[in-house]
Design a protein with these regions (language model features):
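Transmembrane-helix signature of polytopic, membrane-embedded enzymes
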Residues: 113-118, 136-164, 183, 199-203, ...
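Membrane-lumen/periplasm interface segments of specific transmembrane helices
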Residues: 228, 245-320, 335-347, 368, ...
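Start-transfer (signal-anchor) and selected internal transmembrane alpha helices
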Residues: 1-24, 31, 124, 144-145, ...
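Hydrophobic, aromatic-rich transmembrane alpha-helices
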Residues: 234, 307-330, 334-337, 371-378, ...
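Perimembrane helix-loop-helix junctions
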Residues: 197, 224-256, 316-329, 373
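Short helix- or helix-capping micro-motifs
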Residues: 13-14, 154-165, 190, 212-216, ...
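Specific aromatic-rich, kink-prone transmembrane helix
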Residues: 180-198, 203-212, 226-232, 370-374
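Transmembrane-helix motifs of polytopic, lipid-linked glycan transferases
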Residues: 122-148, 186-191
Length: 457
């Protein structure tokens, strides 16, 4: 019953504001990013046309969301979120989110729902909310059953995961790949921990590998946890060679099933792995001004992890306690910390480490479950009782920031200040930060200021 309540409450909190007219009057952005547009149409195409090709919907997508360099359609550039292969248009992004969203779309599509942008946004929003609500449900199950955390504390950390992070303002609001990756990664960890408790139940390692494999198909950044979890498995089972061999084999078998699916649809629809959307970014997109970009991932006034979710300070403290006190699963907590560190390091090297036109630290959303897991040593310690007030203050502040993002993220701040990846000084300005810009927007509406962007006049 508790799990059902968590699922239903989170789904309602994520989805209901979108259908309230008053909310739409405050934030009229119905689809957060064109990155999520092909996922919507891929789901429709799978159901309606039994294909991944988006030829029927290309004009509709291009007219609403053209390539940034082709706004007048004079060059007819294929939008960056699509690929043109052998005369067919296909999504440039992974398709796992589209597949998971089929249950949401199937009845409206079968009954010929009109393909208007409002209808599509509604279904896309419901899909994003549903995926994140499921992620919250399995986060709670993992905390309770995998880490043996008591119910009250599991609810607190699940609430942090759902509402004090970009999961609230961003990833639950559209068909982002990040939400799918989180759901599948949590399931991978859940079954891995079940195997740790019952080493002879190798089916759990098969499921762990399967879910981690599909997480990787959702976003390539999920490859880091796979490698590190496997290394942890090896080094903690060297004294049990037979068990280690069977565990590693079943885990790898799960990965193989996911890989087989990828190679099948890649050969049928993409023909060559080089036609996959991320392939052309593999060698030419590592252009960030490191280490400034790495500091930006964590501390940028308009994008930093610790700025938008200051409650994560307790994740860092949790790691410290795990290492200092050598608690149960201390090695696993170290692995979680390395996953976060390597992910933020890799992202900081990529030219769009700040996530393009998005709210907060979207690009680091992939590792949010590991931030939550690192809070376990803290919330289980005597220091939680001593610092409980500070924890809930930062928790509340983090939730407030997400509600603010839900209301104010509409791309206007980016339109006013975004200088692209070649000059990232705009990401460090406090005076022109997204927070202060939006305060000025409110003052303009109240007639107390002439413009929210004085330099734009």
């Amino acid at each position: 019953m508790t799990q059902l309540k968590i699922f239903l409450i989170s789904l309602a909190v994520f989805f209901i504001p979108f259908i309230i007219p008053g909310f739409r009057n405050v934030n009229s952005l119905i689809i957060q990013s064109e990155d999520t547009v092909p996922s919507i149409f891929t789901t429709i195409s799978i159901i309606k046309d039994q294909t991944l090709y988006l030829d029927k919907y290309y004009v509709m997508m291009r007219d609403r969301y053209p390539h940034p360099d082709d706004k007048d359609f004079q060059k007819d550039l294929t939008p960056f979120y699509l690929r043109k292969i052998d005369g067919h248009y296909i999504t440039a992004f992974p398709i796992v989110t589209s597949i998971i969203s089929i249950p949401v779309f199937i009845l409206p599509v079968i009954f010929n729902m009109p393909l208007t942008w409002d209808n599509l946004a509604l279904l896309g929003h419901l899909s994003g909310a549903l995926i994140m609500a499921l992620a919250g449900l399995f986060m709670f199950k993992t905390l309770r059953e995998g880490f043996d955390l008591e119910e009250k504390k599991s609810k607190i950390l699940t609430a942090v995961f759902l509402f004090a992070t970009v999961n609230f303002a961003m990833l639950s609001q559209a068909m982002w790949q990040h939400g799918t990756l989180q759901l599948l990664s949590i399931l991978g960890i859940y079954f891995f921990l079940k195997h740790q408790k019952n080493p002879n139940a190798y089916i759990n390692m098969l499921f762990s590998g399967l879910f981690f494999g599909f997480a990787f198909l959702s976003r390539p950044t999920a490859g880091l946890p796979i490698l590190l979890i496997e290394l942890y498995l090896i080094f903690t089972n060297l004294h049990k060679i037979d068990n280690l061999f069977k565990s590693a084999t079943t885990f790898t078998s799960g990965l193989f099933i996911a890989a087989s699916f990828f190679f099948w649809y890649n050969s049928v629809f993409y023909y060559d792995i080089q036609n996959q959307g991320y392939s052309d970014q593999l060698f030419g997109s590592w252009l960030s001004p490191f280490p400034v970009s790495f500091l930006g991932v964590w501390l940028s006034p308009s994008k930093g992890i610790l700025i938008f979710s200051p409650v994560f300070i307790f994740s860092i403290y949790g790691l410290y306690l795990a290492v200092k006190n050598k608690i149960d699963k201390a090695g696993l907590y170290k692995i979680f910390a390395v996953i976060i560190l390597l992910h933020t390091l890799v992202i900081s090297l990529w030219k769009h480490w700040y996530g393009g036109w998005s709210f907060g630290y979207r690009m680091s959303g992939d590792v949010l479950p590991y931030f939550i897991f690192l809070m376990i040593p803290y919330i289980n310690s005597v220091y939680f009782e001593k610092t409980k007030k500070l924890f809930f203050v930062l928790f509340g502040l983090s939730v407030f920031i997400e509600i603010y993002g839900l209301l104010f993220f509409d791309g206007i701040w980016h339109a006013a200040y975004d200088l692209g990846f070649e000059n990232t000084s705009w990401l460090w300005s406090i005076k022109d930060s997204q927070f202060l810009f939006d305060i000025r927007r409110v003052l303009v509406k109240l007639g107390l200021m002439a413009s929210a962007c004085p330099k734009c006049l």
